[in-house]
Amino acid sequence: MNYGVEKLKLKYSKHGCITCKIRKKRCSEDKPVCRDCRRLSFPCIYISESVDKQSLKKIKADIQHQLISKKRKHAPDSAQKAAVATRTRRVGSDEQDNQVYLSKPLEDCISQKLDSMGLQLYNYYRSHLANIISIAPMNQNYYLNIFLPMAHENDGILFAILAWSANHLSISSSNELRKDEIFVNLANKYTYMSLSHLKTNEGSSACAKLGFLYSLAQILILCGSEICQGDVKFWKILLNIGKNLIENHVGKDVSRILTTTTEEPSLEERIIFPNFNSVVKYWLIVNFIYHDILNFNTTSFPIEQYEKFFQRDQNSLPSSANFIESIDSPIEEIDPLIGINKPILLLLGQVTNLTRFLQTMEQEEMLEHGDKILSLQVEIYKLQPSLMALEHLDDEKKFYYLELFEIMKISTLMFFQLTLLKIDKDSLELQILRNKLDSKLDKVIGTFLEGSLCFPLFIYGVCIQVEDMEKKIDLEAKFDDILKRYKCYNFQNARLLIRKIWQNEADGISEHDLVHMIDELDYNINFA
């Protein structure tokens, strides 16, 4: 019977947190953590309109998993450890690549260490940030498979991860100069806490052997965090600390890290990392090499050592490192940072090192190294991708990885011609390469590989002719498009550096040495 009284309908806010929407509760919309999530210690995440549907789906699935976990009683430690070990060793199919990676569940000890905001930052890294940083399939994403389990064992790594999340959240996708001060302060807080933990534990005898791997992981995460937020100085200090850690525990030859014997891992470490003395070492050094090469400075270790590190000579490895022989080994996988571009990265390092070396010489002395320069050019032209890592992927993903390989190859060739051959950017050869690079960039922007395009975009921008406004506008549009999704400030730094070079050219300042030009502008950025 209708008494003329219309039933009131509860209206749920469109701007509430994702957790309240999943629970079908009204959200107070208090930021950074709403009232219900603060009271119940739930992860509280607000999603901006710019987040794509795939990322939103992953975040929702991850929160649902955490909410369900809170309702269950904790399983015995042994069962939980077995589950973690199984998950760590799992090799997924193409269908699994699209699922959310569910890392080791948040235990009471982690929950007790972090407040609601800390839990939110942890969840943001786990469900979003780690997935956009890595360009590998989900089951090969070491930002999740290695760094997150390490964070459960080491507070310094945990705080470094939280700092990275805060730095990423501080960046606006709509305003290139504005940062959210709340998240900037949080990033500074957790960076300080992480570094304090490193200083506290660096002399611990209990961690003297295997412990340095935790310290190195911590430094590399902080380095990534600083590069992400646009730092142009502190990341270099961190990378140098990483170099010193390696030298102190491995020696002057970084390639020896896979064969250096260390203290037997603890039971917990063997459960979390079945190949602790191989896979983890491999990932940490690859991570270090990647950041070391992509900064236009002389590499911390000779390139020959990096080449030796990547060699697949099983005779140089102990029997405990027999993972090298497997097709599914890290060396044969798609790397989370490099993809299938290791040979290109090594040649890029050679080009940079030789360029820096020749800067100290007179013109006559440079001529003595002509054969080395020409041999490098031949090596770049001969570069071919290894298809072994791609054989289990579908045709679409193969296409994009191969396109990225060509993009990196063309960019390295252009960099080589600008720095060592001193070819003018207005030359026909460089303009042909630039146009070819342009067409391939358009194919990869907007895909899961776009985070690897900082260096290629920079080289493309440097080679745009002074009067070509159409290409300059096109490049600005490319940066705008990527930054809506990727939000890493080293892309902004690359854009600002390109603008400074353009301005110098417009002012009649002619400089044909690209590396010298970057030095003169005092812009020590990292293109990782």
Curated annotation (Swiss-Prot):
For whether the record's keyword set contains Nucleus, the answer is: yes
Q: Please provide, in alphabetical order, the Gene Ontology terms of the cellular component aspect for this entry.
A: nucleus
Subcellular localization, per the record?
Answer: Nucleus
Xref: InterPro entries: Fun_TF (IPR021858), Zn2-C6_fun-type_DNA-bd_sf (IPR036864), Zn2Cys6_DnaBD (IPR001138)
UniProt keyword terms in alphabetical order = Activator, DNA-binding, Metal-binding, Nucleus, Transcription, Transcription regulation, Zinc
Q: Which residues are the signal sequence here?
A: none
GO terms (molecular function) for this protein are: DNA-binding transcription activator activity, RNA polymerase II-specific; DNA-binding transcription factor activity; RNA polymerase II cis-regulatory region sequence-specific DNA binding; RNA polymerase II sequence-specific DNA-binding transcription factor recruiting activity; transcription cis-regulatory region binding; zinc ion binding
Q: Where is this motif: Nuclear localization signal?
A: 55-62
List the SUPFAM superfamilies hit by this protein, alphabetically. Zn2/Cys6 DNA-binding domain
Query: Which CDD domains does the record cross-reference, listed alphabetically?
Result: GAL4
Tell me, which GO biological process terms does this entry list? gamma-aminobutyric acid catabolic process; nitrogen utilization; positive regulation of transcription by RNA polymerase II
Per UniProt, subunit arrangement is: UGA3 proteins associate in oligomers, at least in the presence of inducer.
What task does this protein carry out? GABA-dependent positive regulation of genes required for catabolism of GABA (UGA4, UGA1, and UGA2).
Any further remarks? Present with 1200 molecules/cell in log phase SD medium.
Q: What is this protein called?
A: Transcriptional activator protein UGA3
Point out the gene that encodes the protein. Answer: UGA3
